[in-house]
A protein has these predicted regions:
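GST-like domain detector, emphasizing the conserved glutathione-binding G-site
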Residues: 1-58, 62, 72, 158-168
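Alpha-helix C-capping/helix-to-loop hinge sites
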Residues: 6-10, 24, 77-78, 97-103
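Surface-exposed helix-capping loop/turn segments at secondary-structure junctions
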Residues: 9, 73-84, 123-128
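GST superfamily/GST-like fold recognition
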Residues: 31, 35-40, 80-108, 113-119
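Alpha-helical packing segments of well-folded alpha/beta enzyme cores
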Residues: 60-67, 115
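Residue-level signal for nonpolar/aromatic packing positions in well-ordered secondary structure
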Residues: 71, 89, 119-125
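Acidic/histidine-enriched, glycine/proline-rich intrinsically disordered or flexible terminal extensions
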Residues: 132-168
Protein backbone atom coordinates (compact mmCIF):
# COMPACT_ATOMS: atom_id res chain seq x y z
CA UNK A 1 0.00 0.00 0.00
CA UNK A 2 2.81 2.35 0.90
CA UNK A 3 4.51 2.01 -2.47
CA UNK A 4 1.20 2.30 -4.31
CA UNK A 5 0.40 5.53 -2.51
CA UNK A 6 3.94 6.87 -2.78
CA UNK A 7 4.28 6.12 -6.50
CA UNK A 8 0.72 7.07 -7.31
CA UNK A 9 0.37 3.93 -9.44
CA UNK A 10 -1.58 0.70 -9.15
CA UNK A 11 -3.55 1.93 -6.11
CA UNK A 12 -6.51 4.18 -6.91
CA UNK A 13 -6.97 7.25 -4.75
CA UNK A 14 -10.75 7.49 -5.19
CA UNK A 15 -13.66 5.30 -4.18
CA UNK A 16 -15.09 2.82 -5.11
CA UNK A 17 -11.99 1.68 -7.03
CA UNK A 18 -9.79 2.11 -3.95
CA UNK A 19 -12.09 -0.02 -1.80
CA UNK A 20 -12.16 -2.73 -4.45
CA UNK A 21 -8.34 -2.87 -4.47
CA UNK A 22 -8.26 -2.96 -0.66
CA UNK A 23 -10.88 -5.71 -0.60
CA UNK A 24 -8.77 -7.95 -2.85
CA UNK A 25 -5.50 -7.00 -1.21
CA UNK A 26 -6.82 -8.03 2.20
CA UNK A 27 -8.42 -11.14 0.67
CA UNK A 28 -4.92 -12.14 -0.41
CA UNK A 29 -3.39 -11.27 2.96
CA UNK A 30 -6.03 -13.18 4.93
CA UNK A 31 -6.78 -16.04 2.56
CA UNK A 32 -4.72 -16.82 -0.50
CA UNK A 33 -1.30 -16.09 1.00
CA UNK A 34 -1.73 -18.03 4.25
CA UNK A 35 -3.40 -21.02 2.60
CA UNK A 36 -0.82 -21.20 -0.20
CA UNK A 37 1.87 -20.96 2.46
CA UNK A 38 0.37 -23.94 4.27
CA UNK A 39 0.21 -25.95 1.04
CA UNK A 40 3.85 -25.06 0.41
CA UNK A 41 4.83 -26.23 3.88
CA UNK A 42 3.12 -29.61 3.56
CA UNK A 43 4.24 -30.21 -0.04
CA UNK A 44 7.82 -28.94 0.23
CA UNK A 45 8.94 -29.28 3.85
CA UNK A 46 6.75 -31.70 5.81
CA UNK A 47 8.08 -34.72 3.88
CA UNK A 48 11.39 -34.08 5.69
CA UNK A 49 9.69 -34.98 8.99
CA UNK A 50 8.35 -38.34 10.12
CA UNK A 51 4.65 -39.01 10.13
CA UNK A 52 1.70 -38.98 7.81
CA UNK A 53 0.99 -35.47 6.56
CA UNK A 54 -1.51 -36.49 3.88
CA UNK A 55 -4.57 -35.10 5.71
CA UNK A 56 -2.92 -31.69 6.17
CA UNK A 57 -1.64 -31.56 2.61
CA UNK A 58 -5.06 -32.50 1.24
CA UNK A 59 -6.86 -30.00 3.47
CA UNK A 60 -4.72 -27.05 2.39
CA UNK A 61 -4.69 -28.09 -1.27
CA UNK A 62 -8.50 -28.11 -1.17
CA UNK A 63 -8.60 -24.67 0.41
CA UNK A 64 -6.12 -23.32 -2.15
CA UNK A 65 -8.31 -24.81 -4.88
CA UNK A 66 -11.40 -23.16 -3.36
CA UNK A 67 -9.67 -19.78 -3.30
CA UNK A 68 -8.70 -20.14 -6.96
CA UNK A 69 -12.40 -20.75 -7.59
CA UNK A 70 -13.24 -17.47 -5.85
CA UNK A 71 -10.72 -15.69 -8.07
CA UNK A 72 -12.05 -17.42 -11.16
CA UNK A 73 -15.61 -16.23 -10.51
CA UNK A 74 -14.60 -12.58 -10.06
CA UNK A 75 -12.21 -12.70 -13.02
CA UNK A 76 -15.14 -13.78 -15.16
CA UNK A 77 -16.47 -10.24 -14.67
CA UNK A 78 -13.25 -8.24 -14.99
CA UNK A 79 -9.75 -8.39 -16.40
CA UNK A 80 -7.95 -8.03 -13.06
CA UNK A 81 -9.04 -8.62 -9.47
CA UNK A 82 -10.12 -5.05 -8.79
CA UNK A 83 -10.80 -4.08 -12.41
CA UNK A 84 -7.53 -2.47 -13.50
CA UNK A 85 -4.11 -3.97 -12.79
CA UNK A 86 -3.29 -3.06 -9.18
CA UNK A 87 -1.34 -3.93 -6.07
CA UNK A 88 -4.01 -6.56 -5.37
CA UNK A 89 -2.89 -8.46 -8.47
CA UNK A 90 0.77 -7.93 -7.59
CA UNK A 91 0.20 -9.38 -4.12
CA UNK A 92 -1.82 -12.37 -5.35
CA UNK A 93 0.23 -13.37 -8.38
CA UNK A 94 3.22 -14.90 -6.51
CA UNK A 95 0.91 -17.25 -4.61
CA UNK A 96 -0.55 -18.56 -7.86
CA UNK A 97 2.85 -19.14 -9.51
CA UNK A 98 3.41 -22.34 -7.51
CA UNK A 99 0.25 -24.05 -8.77
CA UNK A 100 2.26 -26.81 -10.53
CA UNK A 101 4.15 -27.72 -7.36
CA UNK A 102 0.78 -27.94 -5.60
CA UNK A 103 -0.49 -30.27 -8.36
CA UNK A 104 -3.26 -27.88 -9.40
CA UNK A 105 -4.54 -27.87 -12.96
CA UNK A 106 -4.82 -24.14 -13.59
CA UNK A 107 -6.71 -24.84 -16.81
CA UNK A 108 -9.71 -25.78 -14.64
CA UNK A 109 -9.81 -22.08 -13.76
CA UNK A 110 -9.90 -20.48 -17.21
CA UNK A 111 -10.21 -16.92 -15.91
CA UNK A 112 -7.37 -17.36 -13.43
CA UNK A 113 -5.27 -18.86 -16.24
CA UNK A 114 -5.97 -15.82 -18.46
CA UNK A 115 -5.16 -13.45 -15.55
CA UNK A 116 -2.00 -15.39 -14.67
CA UNK A 117 -0.74 -15.42 -18.26
CA UNK A 118 -1.47 -11.70 -18.69
CA UNK A 119 0.47 -10.77 -15.56
CA UNK A 120 3.32 -13.18 -16.29
CA UNK A 121 3.79 -11.57 -19.71
CA UNK A 122 4.34 -8.10 -18.24
CA UNK A 123 8.03 -7.12 -18.72
CA UNK A 124 8.53 -5.96 -15.12
CA UNK A 125 7.01 -9.18 -13.79
CA UNK A 126 9.25 -11.27 -16.07
CA UNK A 127 12.30 -9.43 -14.70
CA UNK A 128 11.19 -10.14 -11.14
CA UNK A 129 10.64 -13.82 -11.87
CA UNK A 130 14.07 -14.11 -13.46
CA UNK A 131 15.80 -12.36 -10.55
CA UNK A 132 14.23 -14.73 -8.03
CA UNK A 133 14.95 -18.00 -9.83
CA UNK A 134 18.25 -18.66 -8.11
CA UNK A 135 16.75 -18.17 -4.65
CA UNK A 136 13.97 -20.74 -5.03
CA UNK A 137 14.76 -24.25 -3.86
CA UNK A 138 11.46 -25.31 -2.23
CA UNK A 139 13.08 -27.34 0.52
CA UNK A 140 15.53 -29.22 -1.68
CA UNK A 141 18.95 -29.66 -0.15
CA UNK A 142 18.11 -28.05 3.19
CA UNK A 143 20.29 -29.28 6.04
CA UNK A 144 18.83 -30.94 9.12
CA UNK A 145 20.09 -28.02 11.20
CA UNK A 146 18.24 -25.56 8.97
CA UNK A 147 15.06 -27.62 9.17
CA UNK A 148 15.37 -27.68 12.95
CA UNK A 149 15.78 -23.91 12.98
CA UNK A 150 12.86 -23.41 10.61
CA UNK A 151 10.28 -25.73 12.15
CA UNK A 152 11.23 -26.99 15.57
CA UNK A 153 11.22 -23.67 17.38
CA UNK A 154 9.22 -22.83 20.44
CA UNK A 155 9.63 -20.25 23.19
CA UNK A 156 12.12 -22.44 25.08
CA UNK A 157 14.35 -23.16 22.07
CA UNK A 158 14.41 -19.49 21.06
CA UNK A 159 15.43 -18.48 24.59
CA UNK A 160 18.20 -21.10 24.52
CA UNK A 161 19.47 -19.81 21.18
CA UNK A 162 19.51 -16.26 22.56
CA UNK A 163 21.54 -17.37 25.61
CA UNK A 164 23.95 -19.23 23.35
CA UNK A 165 24.46 -16.11 21.22
CA UNK A 166 25.09 -13.98 24.33
CA UNK A 167 27.93 -16.31 25.33
CA UNK A 168 29.59 -16.03 21.91
Amino acid sequence: MYLGEKAGKFFPQKSPERERVLEWLFWQVGGLGPMAGQVSHFVNYAPNFPGDHSYSEERYKNEYDRLLGVMDRILNEREYLAGDYSIADMASFPWVTAYKRYEVNLDLFANVRRWFDAIKSRPAVRKGIDVGKAARNFGEGISKESLKTMFKQDAKSIAEMAKKKEKE
